[in-house]
Amino acid sequence: MKTFSPKPEHISHQWFLVDAHNKILGRLAAQIAHRLRGKHKPEFAPHIDNGDYIVVVNCEQIKVTGNKQEQKKYYRHSGYVGGLKETTLKTLLEKKPAEVLIHAVRGMLPKNRLGRAMLKKLKVYAGPEHQHIAQQPIPLSLPY
């Protein structure tokens, strides 16, 4: 019996809409990464990008457990000596709420060219409106 490898004509990408209102950040990111990779499909192959497009709205109302609002830190470097900058989750949620979810999902995807292509299929918006009405995304209710 030969191993099945999906061909381009077998691959279909659907659009899904996820509401992040009162969802927990890590659990939501894990489920989104699972769908972006295409692991929910029976024709999954690790070397092919057959995942779906995910549109996430209400990202500003995302929740975290414990004291992560004040204790979790995000680091970035300016490229100069002594240029390590740090921000807390609370300040990042106030300034750029979409970046919090993108950063969490990016850490759960492969760190290669395929992972970068999968991340481009994630569309995150802070408020309830999005600009992908023409794609007719299907509302997706995630279990937790």
UniProtKB/Swiss-Prot annotation:
InterPro entries: Ribosomal_uL13, Ribosomal_uL13_bac-type, Ribosomal_uL13_CS, Ribosomal_uL13_sf
Gene3D superfamilies: Ribosomal protein L13 (3.90.1180.10)
Keyword Ribonucleoprotein: yes
Alphabetically ordered keywords of this record: Ribonucleoprotein, Ribosomal protein
GO terms under biological process: negative regulation of translation; translation
GO molecular function, one term: structural constituent of ribosome
UniProt xrefs under Pfam families: Ribosomal_L13
Highest taxon in the source lineage: Bacteria
Annotated GO CC locations: cytosolic large ribosomal subunit
The UniProt record lists the keyword Ribosomal protein: yes
Record's subunit section: Part of the 50S ribosomal subunit.
Reported function: This protein is one of the early assembly proteins of the 50S ribosomal subunit, although it is not seen to bind rRNA by itself. It is important during the early stages of 50S assembly.
Family the entry assigns: Belongs to the universal ribosomal protein uL13 family.
This protein's name: Large ribosomal subunit protein uL13
